[in-house]
Amino acid sequence: MVSAVENMAANTTWASLGKATDLRNRILFTLALLIVYRLGTFIPVPGIDGAALRDFMENAGQGIGGMVSMFTGGALGRMGIFALGIMPYISASIIVQLMTSMVPSLEQLKKEGAQGQKKINQYTRYGTVALATVQAYGLAVSLESGDLVTEAGFYFRMTCLITLVGGTMFLMWLGEQITARGIGNGISLIIFVGIIAEVPAALAQFFASGRSGSISPAVIVGVIVMVIATIAFVVFMERALRKLHIQYPRRQVGMKVYDGGSSHLPIKVNPAGVIPAIFASSLLLLPVTISTFSGGSTSPVMSWLLANFGPGQPLYLLFFIAIIVFFAYFYTFNVSFKPDEVADNLKNQNGFVPGIRPGKKTAEYLEYVVNRVLVLGSMYLAAVCVLPEILRGQFAIPFYFGGTSVLIVVSVTMDTIQQVQSHLLAQQYEGLIEKSNLRGKGKTRKKRSPARK
């Protein structure tokens, strides 16, 4: 059955997109909302000194400024209304998901199905407002400390706070609308578009540095090879599977006995996808962002954070690896692959792993297999996210290039294409069903009652 579906998906061409009206509408809806997001990144927060901000971001572009600007689609560099990006929502999601594993009442809500999930989503929105408020106020104070505003004071702080919080909530709504009525995951697509939008400027800066002689031709070739190799490696690892053999017993229907079939349970090497990298980046970006915009007025704690937790610093890399590994395991076993639920589904379908008893023993075996697979998956995530950071520091590349960005772009692209193919496949199945129904009706019409004598 799986091979038949794969063959049909392979034979599905993009020419059939014109016939899939629902899919075409979803794609157009998604593109329209993403264009709205991009336009919003160019609307500035009131009270910002544009010239001072441009000078500041040119100096900060090589370090954390370039990293944050990449993740916000350049909105932070222009201090647009979407300067906080979607990161407060991601941070709130992290906190709520952690609490659902520790607080019994939230864990019970999680088990209540759609209604419980709706309540958890509401808590996530409340958390987003709270985090965005704290981050927006901290950013407003930091902008004042860095002499990047035209007129400092209470009015600017409140204006900045309301504008940035409103921008984040609007982005959250855009992401939810894309997920529900568009194609792909809305939050991931917003981050994806923000990264892609900054790539042309980064490439122009990179090649301009090569023409001026500040970067040697060998480094340019090395960076290009590294980017291509990283993309190929990410594609390979994201498609890598551990196939678990599943056996189905013989079954009797009436007087007929059907032989038991067999299939495979695909377990991805990286079941959590790009989520651990996004979570880790969102947690590490906040304190350093505030300390960066504070200029020379930072406290000793913020100065220490900026010195030790900037991209490429040893402590930054160690914490980055630790957070990625933690969320790779946490997100896999709490969201993307739950061994208990998978074991129950197999038991209900009379499927079993050869040599393993159905039920609890199967769940334990699945957990054992996924734990072993995740060792490779988490190492892959950490390597892709951290190695480009180390190489960028060694070769003094004058713009931000992170493996996290490449990972997000490749993973979101593959996921979106897969969803488009799924919609096209469903459209093809609907066409086959309609044709079979029409043929059935034609045959019934040909049958006439015998003429009376």
What residues fall within each predicted segment?
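N-terminal cationic and glycine-rich segments that engage phosphates or anionic surfaces
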Residues: V2-K110, Q115-K453
